Each structure stands twice: as C-alpha cells, then as structure tokens.
C-alpha cells in the first residue's frame, strides 16, 4: 500500500547542471508499520488465529506439519505488490531451507493468501484453504515471512516457555484487552528444538508492542538486546535453524555452493593454467598490487576492526604473454528446480591492467559419459582497476550438470597485479537486476549530493536508474524512469512493475543474510498534481537531464523512499563492510500475477561481451572418470520434456570445439572398434595355436 508525498527538489545531476525534478515518495515519514500497529488499527488483538472446535495447534504435533512443497493460492483480492513480495519471500525460504511452495493443483490442504483486515495466520496446518491475511500495509518481506512461519507451525519467540529467563514482560504497560498476546506456550505443546532464545527472531515482538503509553512492554534481561528485539528485516539464522530442524531438512531447495576460502579450503575447486611460467590461481592472504586482505574479514560498521586473517583466490597477470590464461573451476552441480535459472554471486578485486580480462563460463555435461562438457561464456569483467572489493552477479541458465569456470586472461598492457575473487555463492534463484555500490561510505554519508546508478534496462526494454541520497541520520532511495533506445516500441505507461530495493547484508554466506528490502509497484492510479501518470514515457512528461555518459536524456519523477534506512540499522550487521554499502535492485513485471499465482520462469538478459575469446576450449582442468561402457539403448523412448523457456545471452562469438577422434569415451582413450578386423583375426589364430 502506497502513501504519496509530493515534493519538488533541485537535484544535482552533473557538476554543472541542476534540474527541478518531481519527487514522489511512497513511504510515510518514519519506519514502516509493524504487525502490532497494523492490527491494532484494525481492532485485532493478535496475528494468530484460533480454529473453532479445534484444540490449539502445537508445533510438537506432526499432524500440523505441512508436506513440502506447500500448496497455496494468491487470491484475487490481494494487492499486486503483496503478491510480488510473497513470491520473493518464497525464494528466501527456498534459499535457506528445504521448504518449497507451489500453486495449488488439487491438494486438499492449502494456504489461501488473502487481503483481509490485517496481518494474521493460523499456526500450523489446520484445514483446507486456511486463510493467511496480507492486508493493508502488511506487504513487506519480514511481515510475510512472519505470517508464513506461523502457518508452518511457529509461535512468537517471546511466547517460549523459557522466555522469563531472557525477557521481562511488564503487564502494567500493556493496553487493556491485549494481554493474551504475551501468554507463554506450554512446554508440552511446543518445542525450542534445542536452540537458544533468539532476540533477533523475526517472530519476536518489539519492546513497545501493545504499549498503553506508559513505557516498554518487553525488557530484555541483557540490555544490549533491548533495541534488537522486533527486527523486521528477514528470518534470522536461528529462525532458519529451527525451521530446518522442525522439518528435518537435510538440504535446501535452491542453494548449491558457498566458498569463502576460510581455513585454506578450496571447497572442492580445481585450478589449471596455460602459461609458460606456470602462474595461475593461488590461495593467498594478500596480493601484489592489492588487495591487502580478503573480503570475508573486512571490518564492518558494527565491528570496527577486522579481527581475523582470511584467504582469497588470486590470479596474477603481472608476468606472461598476452592471451595466457589461468582457470579456477568449481565442483559439479545439478540443477534441481523446474525453472532453469541460477545466480552466481562473488566479490572481485581488479589490480591488473585495464586490458586484462576475467571471463565467467559454465561448462555443461550431457551425461555421466561426457568428460569434456560444453562451455558457454556467461559474463566478463575488464577495464579500470578497483580500489575496493566489488560485488558481481552473473545470471546462469544451466539445464544439465554443470560447473562454473573463472578464467583470468593476461591483456596487452603492463600489469602489476591481477584478479582476485572471494565469497562465492551460487543459488537457483534469479539474480538481482542490478547493483549500486557506494565505496568510501563514511565520506559519502557526509556528502548530501545524490548518487545515481548507470542507466539500466529491463528485459523488455524500459530504461530507469536508481538514486541514493545520504542525509546523515538516514538515506533516501528512489528509482526514476529514463528515456531509452526502445521507447517508441514500448507500451506506456509502464504499469504493474515491482521495484525492489535492497540494502545488502554482506555476510559471507548468502544463507545467513538478513538484508533490508522494500518494494512498491507501479499503478495506473499513480498520478501527479497535473493528473499525469508517473510511469508514462519520460519523453512526454519528463525533465531533461544529463546521464552518466554526459548524454542528454529525459527523466520522470523520482519515486521511492524518503527514509529507506536509519543510521542505527545501517550500522548494524554487515550492511557496511570495508567502508562499502551495496544496494541491489530488481524491476519485475508482475502483470502475470493479475490472474495467476506464480510468475513464468525468468528470462536471461542479453550479455554484452567486449572481448570474445578466440582460442579453442581445452576441456576442464580435471576430467572426471567416466564409465567404461555405455548402457544398452532402451527399447522404449522416454517421453521428451522441454525445459522452460529462457532467453539465452546474445552470442557474440562462437567457441569452436576440436573434432573428437572417437565417439567412444573410454577412460583409456581408444576404442576396440577402431582396431582393424584382420589384426584381430590374426591375434585370435595365434592364441588358439599356442600349446
């Protein structure tokens, strides 16, 4: 739900020009509303429903536990923005647990997600079509995760039977009629799964929940957690542990790999090089030309000094001839989800020459007999050096068993460094559509100017950019439609598109992230004081600006969040790391959700490769051992299944494979079928004539 605040500001879009641009914020001044505030305004005393004629559900009872994937229906009364947030929340569950969700087919038990009066759910699986309400103001990541945790069988954290050892409930400060929200759950009806009390749980009330105005209702016995309880970013790591233990998860639905090279572990990766001096990827603590330390142990705003010494992988380009390469390849992974889309996230540091190149490939294997595989170039990094570790995302679309290859290639110039990588994560969810990294954060925070991202394009051609402005105690975060090269071909206004802005938690392991994100969706009802739709073609109702390339463009209103995050949140966890703050963003088409409960599989945007490699593929660094013989052909053909539609990156150069000398893939490198039959006959005769 959006509340529009109209402002007009003079924005510096270049060192020479300022233009008056309309600013239309979708947030109210202050923090987003919490569940208790939303429900109190709706005259609801709790966000937990009690089923009539059914004993209160217990997370100790397996009868109330769902089978995964959990069937659901996004009902028509849901706001379109809420639908998009719910699907994003499902991806977080998939990333961190074995819980999956799917649109209902004919299952008896399912969750009916509706827009009712407030935010609420039953605890556990109760009956067919049980309602879960994401009402007005409830469409945030944390609230959606909170309500679905109820549906999965979890009570509030402060309702634990052992809560009195950790918090004190001040009943005299609770508004009359709301005392039941602070009842404890009986030990026989619940379990804590052997985990400690979690002040950081997304299921914990805040300190002022249901206050009558006389002070806090919850006081932590350890004062340092008083401002922690009630966080509304994401599931905490302990929330995830408890969920996985309760559902006996052995693995996650959508996570494949994490490697920070800590304890000098290569995580099953292999290296090889094609150079005369045997230089290649090495595990180091620091590298000539930089960086001086790994990314994992960089100091954060919440821990000013890095206390550990870590490792990262470095490939030097300081010696060797132009075109020499060194490769780092991951272990083999198997796509498991119906949508064949993966996201590779890593941090890199470039201290070499601007002509040096880091190529990112995937190598797919047809079956267990394929030891060579076929590789495709999915991304490329080149250009000027970096002064900080920088985040990078590469969208993948592997349909078979695959591995990722990082290939460092020496350029034509003089290098004194090379490429370094650290903190690799690979998952089966869609990558963010872009990122904006603010290095030298402390300096930027004291500078009140606006920082813009480069111009971005959606998969179907709409142009936009992101704008961040620091205000000392908080920062503003907005997006802005721009004129682009496809404007005449597009449908205007640009409607039912969800903009998600995320302040990234830079914790090394993606599964431990508690990023802060907020989403809004473009609507036909978003109009300014002149009655013009905010999302119309900027060439019609926009203002002339100068973009990052000093090119003239037209820009629509800036729209987003005046107070995206306050300083106390920014300084917590790992939001600022190595003096860098990272914003990721996605601009998602939600039009299919008007009638459906799921989105189609994501399409990959075309990838621009500046320097297509010309050399032949020499195969993987380590060839796996394949079976000696193939199984006999099947007499019946299995039904052919087609993978979901994806758009492959636009090919810029074809990689030529060397011709195979034989179709037999025996580990011995030759086939008996290639031996001439007269020779076999002679050998057989000699054997028979021997005494």
Can you name each region flagged by the protein language model?
Residues 200, 581-582:
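Alpha-helical coiled-coil scaffolding segments
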Residues 14, 167, 217-219, 236, ...:
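Beta-sandwich/jellyroll recognition modules and their flexible linkers
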Residues 2-6, 10-332, 358, 388, ...:
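Zinc-dependent metalloendopeptidases
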Residues 543, 547, 552-556, 636, ...:
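Compact interaction modules built on cysteine/histidine frameworks
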Residues 193, 384-402, 409-411, 516-581, ...:
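Short, surface-exposed tryptophan/glycine-enriched loops
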Residues 475-486, 563-568:
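Charged, amphipathic alpha-helical segments
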Residues 1-9, 393, 667-680, 689-691:
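Classical eukaryotic N-terminal signal peptides for Sec-dependent ER targeting/secretion
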Residues 541, 659-670:
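Juxtamembrane cytosolic/matrix-side boundary and N-terminal portion
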């Amino acid at each position: 739900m959006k509340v529009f605040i109209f402002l007009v500001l003079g924005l510096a879009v270049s060192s020479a020009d300022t233009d008056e641009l309309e600013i239309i914020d979708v947030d109210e001044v202050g923090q987003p509303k919490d569940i208790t505030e939303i429900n109190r305004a709706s005259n609801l005393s709790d966000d937990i429903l009690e089923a009539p004629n059914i004993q209160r559900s217990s997370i100790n009872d397996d009868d109330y536990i769902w089978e995964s994937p959990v069937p659901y229906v996004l009902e028509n009364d849901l706001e379109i923005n809420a639908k998009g947030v719910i699907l994003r929340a499902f991806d977080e569950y998939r990333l961190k647990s074995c819980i999956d969700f799917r649109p209902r087919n004919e299952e008896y038990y399912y969750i009916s997600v509706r827009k009712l009066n407030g935010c609420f759910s039953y605890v556990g699986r109760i009956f067919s079509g049980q309602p879960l309400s994401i009402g007005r103001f409830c469409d945030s990541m944390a609230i959606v995760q909170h309500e679905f945790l109820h549906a999965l069988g979890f009570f509030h954290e402060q309702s634990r039977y052992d809560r009195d050892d950790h918090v004190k409930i001040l009943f005299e400060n609770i508004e009359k009629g709301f005392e039941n929200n602070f009842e404890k759950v009986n030990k026989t009806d619940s379990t804590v799964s052997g985990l400690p009390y979690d002040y950081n749980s997304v299921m914990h009330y805040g300190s002022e929940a249901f206050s009558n105005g006389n002070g806090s209702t919850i006081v932590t016995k350890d004062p340092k957690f008083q401002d922690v309880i009630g966080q509304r970013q994401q599931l905490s790591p302990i929330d995830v542990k408890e969920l996985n233990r309760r559902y006996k998860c052995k693995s996650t639905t959508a996570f494949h790999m994490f490697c920070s090279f800590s304890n000098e572990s290569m995580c099953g990766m292999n290296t090889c090089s094609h150079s005369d001096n045997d230089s290649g990827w090495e595990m180091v603590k620091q590298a000539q030309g930089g960086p001086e330390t790994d990314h994992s142990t960089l100091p954060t705003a919440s821990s000013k000094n890095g206390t550990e010494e870590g490792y990262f992988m470095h490939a030097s380009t300081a010696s060797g001839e132009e075109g020499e390469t060194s490769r780092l390849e991951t272990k083999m992974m198997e796509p498991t989800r119906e949508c064949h889309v993966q996201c590779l996230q890593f941090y890199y540091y470039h201290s070499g020459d601007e002509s040096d190149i880091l190529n990112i490939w995937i190598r797919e294997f047809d079956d267990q007999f394929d030891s060579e595989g076929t590789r495709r170039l999915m991304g490329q990094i080149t250009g000027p050096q970096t002064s900080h570790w920088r985040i990078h995302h590469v969208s993948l679309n592997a349909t078979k068993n695959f591995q990722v290859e990082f290939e460092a290639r020496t350029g034509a110039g003089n290098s004194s460094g090379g490429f370094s990588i650290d903190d690799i994560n690979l998952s089966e969810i869609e990558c963010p559509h872009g990122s904006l990294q603010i290095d030298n954060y402390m300096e930027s925070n004291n500078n009140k100017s606006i920082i813009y991202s480069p111009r971005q394009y959606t998969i179907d051609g709409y142009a936009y950019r992101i704008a961040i402005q620091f205000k000392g105690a908080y920062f503003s975060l907005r997006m802005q439609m721009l004129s682009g090269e496809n404007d005449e071909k597009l449908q205007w206004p640009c409607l039912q598109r969800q903009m998600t802005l995320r302040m990234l938690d830079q914790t090394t392991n993606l599964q431990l992230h508690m990023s802060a994100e907020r989403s809004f969706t473009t609507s036909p009802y978003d109009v300014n004081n002149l009655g013009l739709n905010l999302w119309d073609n900027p060439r019609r109702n926009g203002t002339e600006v100068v973009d990052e390339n000093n090119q003239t463009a037209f820009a629509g209103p800036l729209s987003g969040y005046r107070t995206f995050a306050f300083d106390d949140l920014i300084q917590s966890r790992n939001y600022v790391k190595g003096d860098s703050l990272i914003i990721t963003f996605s601009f998602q088409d939600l039009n299919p959700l008007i009638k459906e409960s799921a989105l189609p599989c994501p399409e990959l945007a075309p990838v621009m490769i500046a320097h297509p490699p010309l050399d032949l593929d020499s195969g993987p660094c380590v060839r796996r051992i394949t079976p000696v013989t193939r199984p006999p052909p099947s007499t019946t053909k299995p039904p052919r299944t087609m993978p979901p539609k994806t758009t492959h990156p636009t090919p810029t150069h074809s990689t030529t494979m060397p011709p195979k000398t034989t179709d037999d893939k025996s580990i011995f490198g030759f086939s008996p079928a290639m031996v001439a039959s007269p020779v076999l006959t002679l050998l057989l005769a000699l054997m028979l004539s021997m005494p």
